[in-house]
Amino acid sequence: VGNKGKGESVWLGFFQYKVLSEFSKICEYYGEKLGREKQAVNNDNLNSSSEINHETEIKRAERYRKIMENLRKALNTNAWDGRWYKRAFMDDGNELGSIQNEECRIDSIAQSWATISGAGDNDKKYISMESLEKHLIDKEAGIIKLLDPPFEKSKLEPGYIKAYIPGTRENGGQYTHGAIWAIIAEAMLGFGDKATEYFRMINPIEHSRTKEEA
């Protein structure tokens, strides 16, 4: 977060972990496939590029897994804030989504993706989702907030979302695909009843069954 290129996004760290996890499987599969093809033909007739690709893909998968290991360690130490994961680190070292913040103390996406990515430590995944439920599930309004409290008076400059009225859109309102990620995370943790409840809660149909609700 910031224009100096020093800021880091925690949720994108989880996203990168997931991407590397999926691509390492592809690289490993492709490398093993080429390896089997190598064994099936006479070495004299082997296309040299296939041999190079076999070694390259296996090494690529190993490199990705090493990056994943380092990412997971960093996310579960530097980004863990005691009850949930922070959202981001700004250029100047300030944090978003920290318990210490007056605004944007907690963000939904970092909690959801700790589970979706598979990178969150087992106990921390459950603790962070409990915090999400406590601070971001608004059953009265029927929404799952992106963050809370919204940006309004603090000196933090997170970008364009601060221009939105507090409690609307990304600034403390519902960011719907972020809300869906929270529901997916609940389901992945085995809380099917909660996932169903929250899905029904945010369903637009449930917000327009009567003229008053609409």
Model-derived regions: residue spans:
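Acidic, mature catalytic/reactive cores of soluble proteins
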Residues: 1-214
